[in-house]
Amino acid sequence: MRALLALEDGRIFEGESFGATGTRVGEVCFNTSMTGYQEVLTDPSYRGQIVAMTYPLIGNYGTNATDQESTQPHVRGFIIEELSKIPSNWRAEESLDDYLRRWEIPGAQGIDTRALTRHLRTRGAMKACLTTEITSPDEAVQRASAGEGVIGMDYVREVTTPNIFQWDPDDQLSRKWSLQSGDQVLPPIRHRIVAFDYGMKRNILRSLRQRGFGVTVVPATTTAAEVLALNPDGVFLSNGPGDPKALPYAHETVRGLMGRKPIFGICLGHQVLGFAFGGRTFKLKFGHRGGNQPVKDLRSGKVAITAQNHGFAVDPDSLPKEVEVTHVNLNDGTVEGMRHKELPIFSVQYHPEAAPGPHDASYFFEQFAELIANSS
């Protein structure tokens, strides 16, 4: 079956449908990861977006329940060059085609993803319509233009937990996956923290528990007073989807916690912290999405290759003098990390937990533990 990808600027790509049929509209973006497509599909940060993978062959190892970063996929559509129709992995439970069909997510293969990526890199991320139903390219372009983008959108309310809960109280979900037999012993809980769920990935929760954190997950709309009533040792701000400017309730809450608890934010949490500091964000031309983004630590001069997924960045000129930019992206010079010079608060724009991606930045979880220990 024919699949049509129409961009709001009139560019048309034709391919073959896989997964579900139907019509979906959202911002189209590209991810440069070679593997980890299931983690990409189930990352809540992709809520409202159509994702194109730049690696040419996708679906090689199928899908399984263990590697999901949330309970369900969040992308609106999935664009690839070639689908591997016969997955080959002993852990595979379902093909990518069947998985997307079960979750009613349309996909398109046979798309020239290199040409699509070059177009988005030149023109910028934009709204798109992915359809197996609309036969007229002009109509599909009109649907794309009339659809919602990401700017001004609060998708966090769609993906946050509705209730407060304790992550993995029985220590059954946080052990590292390994081929080796025998149980892996998790460290004792040294610090109890509250984690704001703006769209949090499971591997963040696993990474925190593996470093000795006991984690209470709270909805994104939880107030500062409600958090303080839990009396945590620290506060974690998670990743998530949408426009950080559209979350005034989160800005207010974090502002109310500053100076009262140590705070560590990543991705959207980093951007929310930027607003809480009194700063602002701006939309990147095409975002940073993939596992090969070079980031420089301005204090040590060291460079790490990082996993990233964001379309906005903190404006360094908007930050007050009490806030120091600590990390920058070597590709475009944008802010990748910051800290408060006087308060126990720091954040990074990227994903130290990876999943998928390199583990160069996993040490930030240990730094958070040290920050809490030194602040108590």
Model-identified regions with their sequence ranges:
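RNA-binding accessory domains that recognize and position tRNA/RNA substrates
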Residues: 1-225, 229-230, 244, 355-357, ...
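Residue-level detector of beta-strand face positions
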Residues: 4-5, 43, 294-296, 327, ...
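Residue-level structural signal for beta-strand termini and adjacent loop
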Residues: 17-18, 56, 309, 340, ...
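Proline-centered loop/turn at the N-terminus of a beta-strand
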Residues: 106, 192, 262-264, 280, ...
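Active-site-proximal beta-strand elements of phosphoester/diester hydrolases
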Residues: 192-197, 306-307, 346-350
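Cysteine-nucleophile active-site neighborhood
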Residues: 234, 239-308, 313, 357-367, ...
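Catalytic beta-strand/loop cores that center a nucleophilic Ser/Cys/Thr
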Residues: 301-343, 376
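A glycine-centered loop/beta-turn motif at secondary-structure junctions
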Residues: 337-375
